[in-house]
Amino acid sequence: MEMSNAQRLILSNQYKLMSQLDPENAEKYQRFQTIVERGYELQMRELNKDYGCITEALCKEIIDVMEMYHAMQESFRMLDADESTQVDQRRLQFLGFDIASEAQLVHYVRFLTESEGLYPQFDKGDHHFNSQMPMLEKYRRMLATWRKCPRQYHLCATELRQIFNA
């Protein structure tokens, strides 16, 4: 994150104010203030990770992933008893993304489900959409398989298994 001296001064002052307004987190804000004032670029990346940007294309892709899970869940509900026994129900749960390596994606999913009220049927579980392992590439393979299905919202057990195994 490159900043001019003026931007660093403004941000430093913001952190100083935050440390005074939020005494419980004062130590954290003072640390951020020191990082910004002294221009420690390695640590400034840490500050940037919370303020990064997700492209419009990636936002749409995340929504597509969530829509795919919605379609799989609805398809499962329409299966007859014989077919439903061929599908591992646990794999129908949308796990989210890895907070360690895909934090912005986790935050976006939380924004969509909490602030925007989308996909209320998704169980956020104990981990609140933190899959605890990188998932984006897996979801991309699943999306590619799902998009090849002729009836994306009326999938059979075989198609569901193919998507899971992508």
Swiss-Prot record:
It comes from the Bacteria. Pfam families: YfbU. Disulfide bonds: none annotated. InterPro entries: UPF0304_YfbU (IPR005587), YfbU_alpha-helical_sf (IPR023146), YfbU_helix-hairpin_sf (IPR023145). Belongs to the UPF0304 family. This is UPF0304 protein VV2347. It comes from Vibrio vulnificus (strain YJ016).
